Amino acid sequence: MVVKRILPLPRPAGLAPPTEVPLDGQDLAMPKMVMHCIWFFLASSQPSLESTSLQELEQAFTLGMQLFLARFPAAGARTRHDKDTARWYLEYNDQGADLEVIQLDRPLQDDWKALDGKCDSVFAPRPVMIFDDDASIFSIKVTRLSCGSVAISTSTHHWLVDFVGYIDLMEELSHCVSIFLNDPNAQINIDEGATKFDWSRDLLAYSKQLEPESIPSATWFTERGSPPQMTRAPSSCHYASLLFTQESLEKLKRSLAEWALETAPTTATDRIVPSKDNWIATNDALHALLWAAITDARGLDLNATTQLHTPLDGRRLLSSLSSADSQSRGKYIGNVHPGHVFPLPSSVVSAKDRSGLFNLAWLIRTQYLNVTPGQMSAIIRHHNYTDAETFGPGRLPKCTSMFGNDVTISNVARIPVRQRLDFGEKLGKPYTLTVVGMVPVTLNGLTLDSADGTCFIIQAPAEWTSKEAVLQHQPRSGDNQAPGGMLVYVGMRSEEMDKLLQNSLLQEFALVL
């Protein structure tokens, strides 16, 4: 086993980032917690892995990370809390990132499927937490198993990047590592082939608003550091893995429209019904069902408010952020997804009356897509906290939003992650990405088993069409990895999970693995 701190190579002056920048309000809208991801490279589908030694992996990742940190200095930075101003800064001090490389004397077997929804600490790297100025905010662990399969796990902080930015980060890392996997003695200029990035974390500069006042304010920073106030008492959580096949997802979307139309002629209501102008996508239908089923399982009072937090679904709402040509500022690094919540009465968010689910899905879709750059800017600038009268209509999640009546859905199933990551001929592309369970959440000293009501959605292999097919599936070299359905990891408090799994619509459209 090798554990070490990797420092960046010296970089040309033209690639040097600023000394420090304040973390943007959009960054701080994300929870103060770790984002874990694990990528599996299967020897059964990549035969060259069997002959790739642990020493080769260690050398390539050491050299590759040195190059990567020179090109992507945000991963080797540190956070700094200025107590006088209450502001959080990202300080580009080149302190590096942590690398761990280990060999396990056992095969991978079905661990890559992560069907039990539990975190396997064997694969997990040191979790990065913002509590110490000298702690790194990016760590990586490379695990080689006796069968030749490799697991690459990372720990990043939600304040550093959202998932779209994380894929930018991993794409750059995979390119850097592939250079030295292909040729351990490779000589390369740091800026040769490097992606241009914008390190300013000034999201509002892209929204072209008339009001140029700076954010974040002292009020913003003070609130983000305040202890969470739980709307429901913390409780231990249980995990479930739900499989929605491509067929069941299409059936779900179609059924929501059919149910809405069945009652439309006889019911006087202000609900939206399907038409050529009012339509929903598969993601919208799935998110509506999950939000409604979780809310029903909680048995909330009809007057209670539940909020949907969709921090990511794979789309950038500011298209200019993805540009990296020489005339632009480069790819924007930081959180770019709408850090807002969508509040509704729990009576509206219910699967008990299935005819209302299309309307709920339509509301989710329009709320998300109508967050324009200008609205996003205003939400961040003027705070709009959910329960403070002085901060507008309540569009931005407080620290407590993931621990109360709310539901958080992170859907990365449509992001082409596998196509973008390539570690070269020996390691290849990852076969799958998984969270391998939801790791414990620590927020200002309070540790919970999981964020209650959190759904993390990834793409499932096309071969996963039944529980039996999932259990028997073993990829082979040359298999065409066609897009499949969606695998949903759901975390809920234990006493409510049974009610969730008894939901008749979930039983109709999902397989419990």
From Swiss-Prot:
Transmembrane segments: none
Protein name in the entry: Acyltransferase uat1
Keyword Acyltransferase: yes
Similarity annotation: Belongs to the plant acyltransferase family.
Annotated catalytic residues: 158
Any one Gene Ontology molecular-function term assigned to this protein's record: acyltransferase activity, transferring groups other than amino-acyl groups
InterPro entries in alphabetical order: CAT-like_dom_sf, Plant_Fungal_Acyltransferase
E.C. number(s) listed in UniProt: 2.3.1.-
Enzyme class: transferase
Keyword presence, Transferase: yes
Origin species: Mycosarcoma maydis
Up-regulation conditions: Expression is strongly induced under conditions of nitrogen starvation. Expression is positively regulated by the cluster-specific transcription factor rua1 that recognizes and binds to the specific 5'-T/G-G/T-C-G-C-A-T-A/T-C/T-C/T-G/A-3' upstream activating sequence found in all promoters of the UA biosynthesis genes.
Superkingdom, natural source: Eukaryota
Alphabetic keyword roster: Acyltransferase, Transferase
Gene this chain is encoded by: uat1
Known role: Acyltransferase; part of the gene cluster that mediates the biosynthesis of the glycolipid biosurfactant ustilagic acid (UA). UA is a secreted cellobiose glycolipid that is toxic for many microorganisms and confers biocontrol activity to U.maydis. UA consists of 15,16-dihydroxypalmitic or 2,15,16-trihydroxypalmitic acid, which is O-glycosidically linked to cellobiose at its terminal hydroxyl group. In addition, the cellobiose moiety is acetylated and acylated with a short-chain hydroxy fatty acid.
This protein's pathway: Secondary metabolite biosynthesis
